[in-house]
Amino acid sequence: MLDRIKACFTESIQTQIAAAEALPDAISRAAMTLVQSLLNGNKILCCGNGTSAANAQHFAASMINRFETERPGLPAIALNTDNVVLTAIANDRLHDEIYAKQVRALGHAGDVLLAISTRGNSRDIVKAVEAAVTRDMTIVALTGYDGGELAGLLGQQDVEIRIPSHRSARIQEMHMLTVNCLCDLIDNTLFPHQDD
C-alpha cells in the first residue's frame, strides 16, 4: 500500500514537470485573454462536470471573492451551481443543453467561456462551446488526453490548455493547479503588488 501511495505522488510530480515544460505559453495566453475580457467590462462563464465542475466553481469563487489578495470582485459565473436551472433544463430531456442554454441566455460578445473537460468529449461541454461560438465569445478550454471533440471546435482566438496525460486523476489535479495559476496571473496583472 505504501508503494502505491508513493507511486501516486511520483506520477503526479512527473505530470507536473511535463506540464511545466509544455503549458506556460498556453496558460499565459489564456490569462491574458481573461484579463482583456475583464478590462473590456465583460464576464467569464465557466462550466464542467464532476471534478471539473468543482474546478469551475473554484475559479468563479476566486474571481468574485478573491484568490490570495484582497481586491474588488471580478465578474465570473459558474454555470453548474444553480440546481433549479440545471434540473429544469435536464427535466425537459435536454441534458446535453444544461450549459448551452445558459451560455445563450447569459453570454455576450467579448465574454469568455472557461470550459473544463478531462477528455474533451462531454456532450454538455461541447454544446456549451458551440453556443459560445454563436455568441462571439472566446473559449479557454482545459482538457487532457487528446483534447477530444472540444479541441476541434476551437478557433484561432481560443486557447486550449491540454494537460499532457492520459490519466483522469492527474489531469484533474493539473486542472486545479492551472486554475490557480490563472487566478494568480489575473490578480497580479490587474492588481500588481507594490513589492513585486
Curated annotation (Swiss-Prot):
Residues 34-196 form the SIS domain. One of its GO terms (biological process) is DNA replication. The keyword Transmembrane helix does not apply. It comes from the Bacteria. GO terms for molecular function: carbohydrate derivative binding. Keywords: DNA replication. SUPFAM superfamilies: SIS domain. InterPro entries: DiaA, GmhA/DiaA, SIS_dom, SIS_dom_sf, SIS_GmhA/DiaA_subfam. Pfam families: SIS_2. Belongs to the SIS family. DiaA subfamily. PANTHER family: DNAA INITIATOR-ASSOCIATING PROTEIN DIAA, SEDOHEPTULOSE 7-PHOSPHATE ISOMERASE / DNAA INITIATOR-ASSOCIATING FACTOR FOR REPLICATION INITIATION. Homotetramer; dimer of dimers. Required for the timely initiation of chromosomal replication via direct interactions with the DnaA initiator protein. This is DnaA initiator-associating protein DiaA. It comes from Klebsiella pneumoniae subsp. pneumoniae (strain ATCC 700721 / MGH 78578). The lineage of its organism: Bacteria, Pseudomonadati, Pseudomonadota, Gammaproteobacteria, Enterobacterales.
